[in-house]
A protein has these predicted regions:
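Class I S-adenosyl-L-methionine-dependent methyltransferase catalytic core
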Residues: 1-154, 160-214
Length: 214
């Protein structure tokens, strides 16, 4: 939040953020994960509250367009009503939610991205390092549809850094990403560096300056 106060108006072409939803989602997924896949995450308390409205006002100020995950949990804090939501259809059943929603500032129709992200039915296996991690393929789809010409992107809650990996793959995106949790930052940095070491052309040529390194 502090860093945004020094950012000029409309500095970023797009802000894609996944802030805490304020519903205890992280700990809930920790329990579900133990039951289904034995994946354990550390106990967290940052997901008990969603950001204050001043955060969302700043996001709108510093970026030309915004995509905000989980906004259905704090809709009253959104800058304005929008017809264009993104629905990530997880193609899963049972007690789990059918998918996740993101509010956007775009004026197009609601769009759906279908990608299986549960248990043995995952379309593309990914190492899970964060309780609210999203697949890289989701961000690939977002950039293709909402930022095809590239540009500057802000992510205030980096988490697993799936967004950053997708930006590296795109090759035409300048990404500014922040993560304040030291443990998640360390794990995510290792994940990104592993991706860079695997021979992707753009990954090899794109240098990352780790501003939050501890």
């Amino acid at each position: 939040m502090e860093f945004m106060r020094n950012v000029p108006d409309k500095h970023y072409d797009l802000a894609i953020v996944d802030p805490p939803y304020g519903i205890g989602e992280a700990n809930e997924k920790r329990m579900q994960s133990r039951h289904h896949s034995q994946r354990k995450y550390k106990g967290v308390d940052w997901d008990k509250f969603s950001p204050e409205i001043v955060y969302f006002n700043e996001i709108k100020r510093v970026s030309k367009n915004q995509i905000i995950w989980g906004a259905n949990h704090f809709i009253s804090k959104m800058p304005f009503d929008s017809p264009c939501w993104i629905f990530w259809d997880k193609d899963q059943y049972g007690d789990f939610a059918d998918g996740e929603l993101a509010w956007t500032s775009f004026s197009t129709a609601l769009r759906k991205f279908r990608f299986t992200w549960h248990g043995f039915r995952k379309q593309i296996p990914e190492n899970r390092i964060h309780p609210t991690q999203k697949p890289v393929a989701l961000y690939d789809w977002i950039y293709k549809n909402y930022l095809p010409d590239g540009g500057k992107v802000l992510d205030t809650h980096g988490g697993s850094m799936s967004n950053l990996i997708s930006a590296i793959k795109a090759g035409n995106i300048e990404m500014h990403v922040y993560e304040i949790d030291k443990d998640y930052f360390k794990d995510a940095k290792q994940r990104v560096e592993l991706f860079q070491s695997q021979g992707n052309l753009f990954a090899e040529s794109q240098k990352i300056e780790w501003m939050g390194e501890v």
